[in-house]
Curated annotation (Swiss-Prot):
InterPro entries: Ald_DH/histidinol_DH (IPR016161), Ald_DH_C (IPR016163), Ald_DH_CS_CYS (IPR016160), Ald_DH_CS_GLU (IPR029510), Ald_DH_N (IPR016162), Aldehyde_DH_dom (IPR015590). The active site is at residues 260, 295. NAD(+) binds at residues 159-161, 185-188, 238-242, 261, 394, 460. Forms homodimers. PROSITE patterns: ALDEHYDE_DEHYDR_CYS, ALDEHYDE_DEHYDR_GLU. It comes from the Eukaryota. Pathway: Amine and polyamine biosynthesis; betaine biosynthesis via choline pathway; betaine from betaine aldehyde: step 1/1. This is Aminoaldehyde dehydrogenase 1. GO terms for molecular function: 4-trimethylammoniobutyraldehyde dehydrogenase activity; aminobutyraldehyde dehydrogenase (NAD+) activity; betaine-aldehyde dehydrogenase (NAD+) activity; gamma-guanidinobutyraldehyde dehydrogenase (NAD+) activity; nucleotide binding; protein homodimerization activity; sodium ion binding.
């Protein structure tokens, strides 16, 4: 087991390149979801702290040491941060697991991905220098035009607790690469590693105010950030109701937002798959990785009727083989959910499904060997109909619901029977069928013969109530750039639109 005695640093808010105590001096306890014990606390920012952070960010943009940097100069900072993350990987991964309940294996993988994301956007920052000014050919000899790509300005980044540092970096890295000054507001349920990012930025000498980190409650810190008149954009990942509130606040100022709001993603399994075990493992990974706390989790299994019995038998055996334990234990593959509130929410979904007539095929309660912690067994629910809550609503926990189908048309109808549109997966060796499903799925992300692989180079985002805008890839960088048209009149001839006045 990893060392659970790693000390929890007692940080303040990271504003203007230094640690600052919150104006109201309040703090929020940190609860280890594996033990239910308080292991530390984080500062609780309020509107007053948001004002200070916004001012620090605006000063950073106005100063030459950040506001006038080239992409190549910003890339050096991003690469320095990446190197520090890898240097501190072991401690950061342990802190992440203690804070959020993620398995240590997943937390360590997240740190590799964090460093990789900074490296990726360092490359895009360098490439931005040659793209900053792009000439545009016009059908006119009298004008010369070009397009400028410029940083949007001060951006607010509000991020979730399920991948605390990684999903923060999906926004921080491109924002800094673009030359924006950012204010990061992570979830109060898991903020430790985001605060440690502040220490890393201090250590590598990131110009003050380029990145500011405010921990605290959503209404007290996130709300004032979203509605602040001097914040030029909000990028948010989280729940639908909170996303709606952010849109409402931003709308008053006609402020741009990008939103990633979760989903109820399907995985469709056809009878022509070559190997039941391969398909079963991908199905499990799609819903039980990160304890099911994944916005794109393929939480609805739609399996062809004539293989359903055999496939479910294999799926059940794989599920019962998952090691559930303290997330710091070696080979742990499923830890606790993040909080008491999330624990009660997941169990309520399971209870409601049973009350509505569904069958709890396996799981559905606390593992018997774990008396403390917010643990929920990996759960598979069958005999589900499309009117049930468990079919329609995002659980955000280790819960898979199952339906069968006979025809492709039925499978598509079931797959798209959701208000969300983030991800979808299809398992089949028929290439043409996979192409048909790629076109038919009403989602922003499609996986063929897999579920959940994620790459820095590819766009991440959805349709319908899963939100709009894209993280990652070149699209993630464009989120934080403003396009400015510049046109010059180059002819010596007068415009000749108005009648020239007499010279007398």
């Amino acid at each position: 087991m990893a060392n659970r005695n790693v000390p929890i640093p007692r940080r303040q808010l990271y504003i203007g390149g230094e640690w600052r105590e919150p104006v109201k001096k309040n703090r929020i306890p940190i609860i280890n979801p594996a033990t239910e014990e308080i292991i530390g606390d984080i500062p609780a920012a309020t509107a007053e702290d948001v004002d200070i952070a916004v001012e620090a960010a605006r000063k950073a943009i106005a100063r030459d040491d950040w506001g006038s940097t080239t992409g190549a100069q910003r890339a050096k900072y991003l690469r320095a941060i990446a190197a520090k993350v890898l240097e501190k990987k072991s401690v950061l991964a342990t802190l992440e697991s203690l804070d959020s309940g993620k398995t240590l294996y997943e937390s360590a993988a997240d740190m590799d991905d964090v460093a990789g994301c900074f490296e990726y956007y360092a490359g895009l920052a360098e490439a931005l220098d040659s793209r900053r000014m792009t000439p545009v050919n016009l059908n006119s000899d009298s004008y010369k035009s070009y397009v400028l790509r410029e940083p949007l300005g001060v951006v607010g980044l509000i991020t979730p607790w399920n991948y605390p540092l990684l999903m923060a970096i999906w926004k921080v890295a491109p924002a800094l690469a673009a030359g924006c000054a950012a204010i990061l507001k992570p979830s109060e349920l898991a903020s430790i590693t985001c605060l440690e990012l502040g220490e890393i930025c201090r250590e590598i000498g990131l110009p003050s105010g380029a990145l500011n980190i405010l921990t605290g409650l959503g209404p007290e810190a996130g709300g004032p950030l979203a509605s602040h008149p001097h914040v030029d954009k909000i990028s948010f990942t989280g729940s639908g109701p909170t996303g709606s509130k952010i849109m409402t606040a931003a709308a008053q100022l006609v402020k741009p937002v990008s939103l990633e709001l979760g989903g109820k993603s399907p995985i469709v399994v056809f009878d022509d798959i070559d190997n039941l075990d391969i398909a079963a493992e991908w199905t499990l990974f799609g819903i039980f990785a990160n304890t099911g706390q994944v916005c794109s989790a393929t939480s609805r299994l739609i399996v062809q009727e004539n293989i359903a019995s055999a496939f479910m038998d294999r799926l059940l055996k794989w599920t019962k083989n998952i090691k559930i334990s303290d997330p710091l234990e070696e080979d742990c593959k499923l830890g606790p959910v993040v909080s008491a509130g999330q624990y009660e929410k997941v169990l309520k979904f399971i209870s409601n499904a049973k009350s509505e007539g569904a069958t709890i095929l396996c799981g559905g309660e606390r593992p018997q060997h774990l008396k403390k912690g917010y643990y929920v067994q990996p759960t598979i629910i069958t005999d589900v109909n499309t009117s049930m809550e468990i079919w329609k609503e995002e659980v955000f926990g280790p819960v898979l619901c199952v339906k069968t189908f006979k025809t492709e048309e039925q499978a598509i109808e079931l797959a798209n029977d959701t208000k969300y549109g983030l991800g979808a997966a299809v398992m089949s060796k028929d290439v043409k069928r996979c192409e048909r499903f790629t076109k038919a799925f009403q989602t922003g992300i499609i996986w063929i013969n897999c579920s959940q692989p994620t790459f820095n180079e590819l766009p991440w985002g959805g349709k319908k109530r899963s939100g709009f805008g894209r993280d990652l890839g070149k699209w993630g960088l464009e989120n934080f750039l403003n396009i400015k048209q510049v046109t010059e009149y180059t002819s010596a001839e007068p415009l000749a639109f108005y009648k020239s006045p007499s010279k007398n």
